[in-house]
Amino acid sequence: MKMQVTAALLALVCALPSLSGAGVIRGTLRVPAAGAQSSGSANAYPGHANSMAGMPRVEHGLVTDAVIYVDPILARVESTLAAVATPAPKLAQKDQTFVPRVIVIAAGSSVDFPNMDPIYHNVFSLSPARRFDLGKYPKGSSRRVDFRKPGLVNVYCEIHSDMAAFILVLPHHAFTRPSASGAYTLPHLPPGSYRLHVWHPDLGTQDVTVDVPASGDVVENLSY
C-alpha cells in the first residue's frame, strides 16, 4: 500500500509541470485541544461484541480530521490531478470504531469497508449523497461502495450505535489533509483567485479567498 501511494505521488509530481505557472497554497491549521474520548457501546451483537467493551474510542476535534480544499478548479487542472491512479481508500471497522474517522474522495471514487474485528458489523448510510446498507459480514471480509455524487456521507453501524464516520465527496481532486502538526499543502494550481475551504466534522466549515500569484507560493494559516 505504501509503495502504491508513493508511486502515485511521484506520478503527480511529474504531471504538475504541465500546469503552466502553477503555484502552491500551503500553511498551518490550528484547532482547539481535542475533546475527551467517547466510551461505551450500544446494541452489541449478542455473544460477541461485549468482549470489545472498554476498547479505546476515537477522540473528537483532532486536526487530522480536517479536510482542506479549493474551488473553482479548471477542467484541465482536474484532468491532471485525476490522471494519477490511487488505490481505493479503506474505512475499516477496527476495535469497534471506524478507522479513519474521516475520508475525503473525489466523486466517482470507491471506498472499501473491511471488517477487522472478531465480531459482526453492519455498515450503512442514509445520506442523500449516497445511501447504502452493506449487511452483516465477519472478520476478514470487505465490501466496496462507489460514490458518484458530491456531498457529505455520514456512515454508521446498525449494530453498534456509537460508531460513526464521515466521507466527504468533493467534485474534484484539489484537496488535502493536514498533518498531525496542522501543516498542509494543496496541489499545484494556476495563478488566480480561489476560495479556500476548511471542513471539520466537529468544528464546522470556514472559507477564505486566496490569490495565487503568477510566481511563488501562498502561505495561508488557518484556525478555528
Regions from the language model: what does each represent?
Residues 1-5:
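Positively charged n-region of N-terminal signal peptides that target proteins for export
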Residues 6-9, 28-30:
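Short helix-onset patch at the extreme N-terminus, typifying the N->h transition
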Residues 7-17:
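Bacterial N-terminal signal peptides
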Residues 19-224:
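Extracytoplasmic copper-binding redox domains, predominantly the cupredoxin/blue-copper superfamily
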